[in-house]
């Protein structure tokens, strides 16, 4: 399991999300509060869209297999960038020499020229049985851009393939439909191959102007009794959000200030503060969509029936 974080709203220094809170994303790499037996030590990645930067439609990109808590470059960058949108990820892998820890496997995934990025918390069990069947559903120009070994990068290519223009800027509804269509394809391939093992697919997908997130799992709770690591996956597919005016210090802690209409939203595997008040748990089998408009943040939660 990994930990994911997405933000959309008022300009906000990255350090407030990665470092400053008492359960920040960097802390979740080595001391996650909702993971008892698993750490996220296989690298960090982020995409950050800053409207004040040169070429604001192109996000700042950073990823490294070093631990983010020891990464001075990341710390300095986080203090300088104040994006209106951020997608970040700390990667967790099984403690095995079969795990491939490499920069090409770090999230968020972003093919050159594409406007959409994707980060994933979860794991498609028995993915090797599905991988080559996915080629039929992924556009050739996208399949040949896959560089890593993860199921997540294939999910990214599959989502892009459902868009009318995988290199264009999708409307929020089109992006949400593409994510749902990708999940339906994955379900069909699993059914065809008799795969019925618990496989979480929590996603954060963004173009920098909108955001789609899912809390979803195929065959939740079904796992081989001899697989102790798989059993520990079950509590880790959490997803939380805080929505309001802007995120900042208030008294002795950090909170999202209330505002109507809202202007900012944070979505994360775990609340960024030990005090969960002000945070809501994303319902299971649901999708969140958010979009920045002139009137504020349009935000919606909907059932995800695929």
What are these regions (language model features)?
Residues 1-306:
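N-terminal segments that mediate ammonia production and transfer
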